[in-house]
């Protein structure tokens, strides 16, 4: 960053004390305080992994991503703050040590001369705190909501999962991973929107949804995947109504996929290069209902490996068979199936951050990961990944009561209101439990 840019940053500099969150990352923290918060997070991660599906090994690369929502994106690694797209060094320090605290959205650095510096993100911006002042990084001043999830057994893990969703919101819209995907996917976008509806962040994707005009995202080799039709209608329902111009186009596409079966009319076509009539029809019905449109379709009684991926409703319309539940390369499949059945057998990453990933996807540009670390590009492994983060978040956020009390059935608020790509403010927002308050924001 040149001198002119840093002059602009200096104009945004503010005294440190008035803007600090009560218990967030600060350059004034003693090293033991930062280590204590990191230890609490790690203890929570251990419990989480024991209760759910353990871990999968991710590369031993310590980094943290800054730039949630529409903000400019940055990578922190080893005393350097990098532009996440170009790899250009924005700031660097000669450090003796650093502590990355993912649930606090921050990093505390100690320099060779004993100065403590913090890079921290909050509901207002990304800040660099040093020498008693903090400066908002240019391009990051945009509001968003960061619930603390206080009272939830896994409040820290939920904060990190939420961050992994928010950091992948781009000017183009919500993407699975901003390094390897330049365009939004309707399926991943719909799952992200379900999570953002819980946390009051739908405004971050509102303009993207309002601007949708195509019934399909055509991201899988240009294919017209019929599950997109229901996903598109559901997305529209979150910010508009049946008069949105995309709705008529979606309805006009339905006849080409319709078939008649013993249970009635349903749709079928190829999603992820295979037919998934149960999954596709469930999404269609979900989208129609979300917009209050007539529904003349019935979920067919057919075996469908994707049936259990749709856990939001119509659970009784399911024929047992072989589920598509790859928990290694496409862990969002396993998490969705676990949500459907109420099982707990899907993993998160073995590192502090990131917790989610996807590997060997056919449409991902893995070469773009070299800016993060060449090992991610070599392994064709993108992390974090929003479908994985959304499935995990939506299962966990309402699966457990606050500390103590009886376990309740999952109550994720995913009922409407009225996939893999493989060739097969400084004050944080409070978070009332979802079983007590149906929707946030």
Which residues make up each language-model segment?
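Non-catalytic carbohydrate-binding regions of carbohydrate-active enzymes
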Residues: 25-62, 68, 300-418, 422, ...
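Well-ordered alpha-helical scaffold segments within catalytic/enzyme domains
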Residues: 138-148, 182, 188-201, 231-245, ...
């Amino acid at each position: 960053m040149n001198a002119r840019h840093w002059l602009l940053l200096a104009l945004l500099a503010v005294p440190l004390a008035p803007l600090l969150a009560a218990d967030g990352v600060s350059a004034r923290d003693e090293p033991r305080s930062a280590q204590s918060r990191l230890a609490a997070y790690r203890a929570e991660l251990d419990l989480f992994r024991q209760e759910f599906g353990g871990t999968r090994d991710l590369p031993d690369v310590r980094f943290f991503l800054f730039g949630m929502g529409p903000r400019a994106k940055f990578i922190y690694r080893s005393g350097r703050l990098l532009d996440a797209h170009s790899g250009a060094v924005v700031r660097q320090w000669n450090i003796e040590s650093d502590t990355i605290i993912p649930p606090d959205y921050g990093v505390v650095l100690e320099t060779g001369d004993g100065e403590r510096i913090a890079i921290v993100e909050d509901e207002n911006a990304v800040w660099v705190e040093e020498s008693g002042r903090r400066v908002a990084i240019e391009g990051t001043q945009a509001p968003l909501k960061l619930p603390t999830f206080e009272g939830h057994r896994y409040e820290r893990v939920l904060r990190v999962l939420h961050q992994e969703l928010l950091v992948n919101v781009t000017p183009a819209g919500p993407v699975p991973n901003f390094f390897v995907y330049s365009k939004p996917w309707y399926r991943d976008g719909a799952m992200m929107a379900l999570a953002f509806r819980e946390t009051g962040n739908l405004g971050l994707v509102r303009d993207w949804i309002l601007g949708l005009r195509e019934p399909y995202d055509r991201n899988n080799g240009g294919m017209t995947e019929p599950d997109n039709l229901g996903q598109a209608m559901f997305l529209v329902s979150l910010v508009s109504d049946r008069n949105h111009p995309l709705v008529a186009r979606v309805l006009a596409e339905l006849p080409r996929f319709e078939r008649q079966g013993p249970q009635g009319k349903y749709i079928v076509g190829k999603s992820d290069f295979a037919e998934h009539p149960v999954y596709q029809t469930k999404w269609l019905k979900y989208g129609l209902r979300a917009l209050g449109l007539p529904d003349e379709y019935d979920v067919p009684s057919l075996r469908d490996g994707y049936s259990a991926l749709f856990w939001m409703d119509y659970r009784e319309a399911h024929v047992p068979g072989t589920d598509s539940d790859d928990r290694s390369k496409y862990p969002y499949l396993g998490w969705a199936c676990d949500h459907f059945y109420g099982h707990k057998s899907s993993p998160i990453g073995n590192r502090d951050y990131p917790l989610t990933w996807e590997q060997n996807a056919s449409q991902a540009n893995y070469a773009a990961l070299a800016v993060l670390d060449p090992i991610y590009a070599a392994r064709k492994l993108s992390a974090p990944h929003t479908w994985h983060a959304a499935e995990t978040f939506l299962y966990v956020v309402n699966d457990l009561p606050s500390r103590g009390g009886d376990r309740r059935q999952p109550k994720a608020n995913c009922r409407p209101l009225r996939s893999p790509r493989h060739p097969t403010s400084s004050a944080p927002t409070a978070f009332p439990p979802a079983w007590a308050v149906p929707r946030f924001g």
